[in-house]
Amino acid sequence: MRVLGIETSCDETGIAVYDDKAGLLANQLYSQVKLHADYGGVVPELASRDHVRKTVPLIQAALKEANLSAKDIDAVAYTAGPGLVGALLVGATIGRALAFAWGVPAVPVHHMEGHLLAPMLEENAPEFPFVALLVSGGHTQLISVTGIGEYLLLGESVDDAAGEAFDKTAKLLGLDYPGGPMLSRMAQQGTVGRFTFPRPMTDRPGLDFSFSGLKTFAANTIRANGDDDQTRADIARAFEDAVVDTLAIKSKRALDQTGFKRLVIAGGVSANQTLRLKLADMMQKRGGEVFYARPEFCTDNGAMIAYAGMVRLRSNLNSELSVSVRPRWPLSELPKV
């Protein structure tokens, strides 16, 4: 079975072809970072228009990369939510139209389920059950996963997501959009311990997160200490350490609560090397394992959508002919497989 995956939920156009026997056959990605950089964030209308321009050419490029034609595709999977409604509609409309024209099923995919299943693309794929830490620009969640579609939300951010806090703090430090990865690189030059940031909501029971206060703490620290290069690097280091420690503390609690031995980290922030090393060390001490996708599959991409679509299609969970998207869509509402 060969599935074409289409990802257009935000500011990346991702197209991929996944074969259930041969694995990933093609992966094409176009990032709109330069388009939105001057605005300091994603402009929804510009994102939608750029997806209109790029999606079909990338589909053609993916088919060429895989040395396939339309007749070789058995299904089309597309991101149906959550995300920006205009951007989602571009991918959904094109995906649905191609499926109709080619006479194959169309499968709407939950964007965060795509992220959650992305580590399954690796050779060392996790087995169920596991705790999933989903960390991106729009979501920070801890989820108990006992099977496909068997998702129990354990905790989530009550305000800013971790990735959003990274980007906002990076902007305070004078870094360009998207600043999260730049902040992490700056943090590598920082002095450990010069500044100490709080670990929000770790002094009380529960698995929810809060990161908006760290941004305010960073702003106050910058004002009080100046913004020379070394001070900025030291602040970046303190901020990143605070976020990583908070994620690790909450993940440990989730593992204790569930009794699971496996931890999956997914989403754009899961590419952060400091976070990976921290969680790997934690899981080694616990006698467990941590799983994550390669960096190119941590950020938005078509490969995770193609794979998730294939999993859903195996259970005949394709949808009707109408085009519909869900900008807000809880993972808990997905059907079990």
From Swiss-Prot:
GO MF terms here are: iron ion binding; N(6)-L-threonylcarbamoyladenine synthase activity
Instruction: Enumerate the cofactors the protein uses.
Output: Fe(2+)
Q: Which InterPro entries match?
A: ATPase_NBD, Gcp-like_dom, KAE1/TsaD, Peptidase_M22_CS, TsaD
Q: Where are the transmembrane segments?
A: none
Reaction(s) this enzyme catalyzes, per UniProt: L-threonylcarbamoyladenylate + adenosine(37) in tRNA = N(6)-L-threonylcarbamoyladenosine(37) in tRNA + AMP + H(+)
Q: Which GO cellular component terms, listed alphabetically, does the Swiss-Prot or TrEMBL entry include?
A: cytoplasm
Q: Where in the cell is it found?
A: Cytoplasm
Binding-site list for Fe cation? 111, 115, 300
Q: Where does substrate bind?
A: 134-138, 167, 180, 272
Q: Note how many cofactor molecules are bound and how.
A: Binds 1 Fe(2+) ion per subunit.
Under the heading Pfam families, the entry gives: TsaD (PF00814)
What is the superkingdom listed in this entry's lineage?
Answer: Bacteria
EC annotation from Swiss-Prot or TrEMBL: 2.3.1.234
Q: Which Gene3D superfamilies match?
A: 3.30.420.40
Which terms are listed as keywords in the entry? Acyltransferase, Cytoplasm, Iron, Metal-binding, Transferase, tRNA processing
**Predominant location of this chain?**
cytoplasm
Q: Name one GO biological process term.
A: tRNA threonylcarbamoyladenosine modification
Instruction: State the protein's purpose.
Output: Required for the formation of a threonylcarbamoyl group on adenosine at position 37 (t(6)A37) in tRNAs that read codons beginning with adenine. Is involved in the transfer of the threonylcarbamoyl moiety of threonylcarbamoyl-AMP (TC-AMP) to the N6 group of A37, together with TsaE and TsaB. TsaD likely plays a direct catalytic role in this reaction.
In the record, the note on similarity to other proteins reads: Belongs to the KAE1 / TsaD family.
**Name this polypeptide is given:** tRNA N6-adenosine threonylcarbamoyltransferase
What species does this protein belong to? Yersinia pestis
Q: Which gene encodes it?
A: tsaD
